[in-house]
């Protein structure tokens, strides 16, 4: 009579079942994207560039054009992370929470005349720079496209203010939360330091639909913070790309927009009941 040792088979089966249930739990529990870029490299494979954005030989992400160390007029550029982010789930109704941090420098030849700032933003994966989006529009909007069709949420770091020309714009440099247009829904004054390294953190708390932006200059430990209620599910498509945009303006109103480092993490918690009803699925973005 043939005999066999069943212990290895039992161990193998137990290992398989453990792996299966871990995988099943992971699919049901969250959909996550996380990355950290401590130093940019030319021709960065993980980034998509639009306009005049580029990476310098020293590993700095330059969002607008710089020639011989000098910022140039009427320049606009974007840099986005190549992999799309699933910001909400059409099947379960769940919305992602995210947090991003980055260090940056804005430097102007004349600190009394600056233009125009930079922004972190979320937009449809195929979003492109609109025409006429230099200067105050930060490469995101123009004078005729401030409506819900944009599907853009941004946090602007605005260095230019011209309240006499644009009554909606605060009469101070500011951090603003933008929804589908350049007129911010909430702002806080920002005491910009010319050439200073700033550390910014932007967080979205999905359970209470709150977008929070804060900025600190390590050199003086002054913190600026603003928050607003934003329903990403009502504004953005299911999949987005995240990144930066910046623009300069008139010949004398220029500055550099340099990003030194960047990290991002998003987690989309699944609705287990809905996932069970609709069978387990692994999400993939298709263009």
Swiss-Prot record:
The glycosylation on N-90 is determined to by of the high mannose type in PubMed:26003537, while PubMed:27720757 found a paucimannose at this position. Processed at its C-terminus. Residues 279-287 form a propeptide. N-acetyl-alpha-neuraminyl-(2->3)-beta-D-galactosyl-(1->4)-beta-D-glucose binds at residues 74, 116, 133, 136, 160, 166, 253. The keyword S-adenosyl-L-methionine does not apply. Coiled coil: none annotated. Keywords: Calcium, Disulfide bond, Glycoprotein, Lectin, Manganese, Metal-binding, Signal. PROSITE patterns: LECTIN_LEGUME_ALPHA, LECTIN_LEGUME_BETA. Mn(2+) binds at residues 156, 158, 169, 174. It holds the Pfam family Lectin_legB. Glycans are attached at residues 90, 142, 208, 220. Gene3D superfamilies: 2.60.120.200. CDD domains: lectin_legume_LecRK_Arcelin_ConA. It comes from the Eukaryota. Ca(2+) binds at residues 158, 160, 166, 169. Residues 1-29 form the signal peptide. GO terms for molecular function: carbohydrate binding; metal ion binding. Sialic acid-binding lectin recognizing oligosaccharides containing terminal sialic acid linked via alpha-2,3 bond to penultimate galactose residues. Binds the trisaccharide sequence Neu5Ac-alpha-2,3-Gal-beta-1,4-GlcNAc. Binds fetuin when fully glycosylated but not when the high mannose-type glycans are removed, although the secondary structure is virtually unaffected by deglycosylation of the high mannose-type glycans. The lectin activity may depend on the presence of a single GlcNAc attached to N-90. Homodimer; disulfide-linked. Dimer of homodimers. Belongs to the leguminous lectin family. This is Seed leukoagglutinin. It comes from Maackia amurensis. The gene is MAL.
């Amino acid at each position: 009579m043939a005999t066999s040792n069943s212990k290895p088979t039992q161990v193998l089966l137990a290992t398989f079942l453990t792996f299966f249930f871990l995988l099943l739990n992971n699919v049901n529990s969250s959909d996550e994207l996380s990355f950290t870029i401590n130093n940019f490299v030319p021709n960065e494979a993980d980034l998509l560039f639009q306009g005049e954005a580029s990476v310098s030989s020293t590993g700095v992400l330059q969002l607008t054009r710089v020639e011989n160390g000098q910022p140039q007029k009427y320049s606009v550029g974007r840099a986005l992370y190549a992999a799309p982010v699933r910001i909400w789930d059409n099947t379960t109704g769940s919305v992602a929470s995210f947090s991003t941090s980055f260090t940056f420098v804005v430097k102007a030849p004349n600190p009394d005349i600056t233009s125009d700032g930079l922004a972190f933003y979320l937009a449809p994966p195929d979003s492109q720079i609109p025409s006429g989006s230099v200067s105050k529009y930060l490469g995101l909007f123009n004078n005729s496209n401030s409506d819900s069709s944009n599907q853009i949420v941004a946090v602007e770091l605005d260095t230019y203010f011209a309240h006499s020309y644009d009554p909606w714009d605060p009469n101070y440099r500011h951090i603003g939360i933008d929804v589908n247009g350049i007129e911010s829904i909430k702002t806080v004054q920002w005491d910009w330091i010319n050439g200073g390294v700033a550390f910014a953190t932007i967080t979205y708390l999905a359970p209470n639909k709150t977008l929070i932006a804060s900025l600190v200059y390590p050199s003086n430990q002054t913190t600026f913070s603003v928050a607003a209620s934003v329903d990403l599910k009502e504004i953005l498509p299911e999949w987005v790309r995240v990144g930066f945009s910046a623009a300069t303006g008139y010949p004398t109103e220029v500055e550099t927009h340099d990003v030194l480092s960047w990290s991002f993490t998003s987690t989309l918690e699944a609705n287990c009941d809905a996932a069970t009803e609709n069978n387990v699925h692994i999400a993939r973005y298709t263009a």
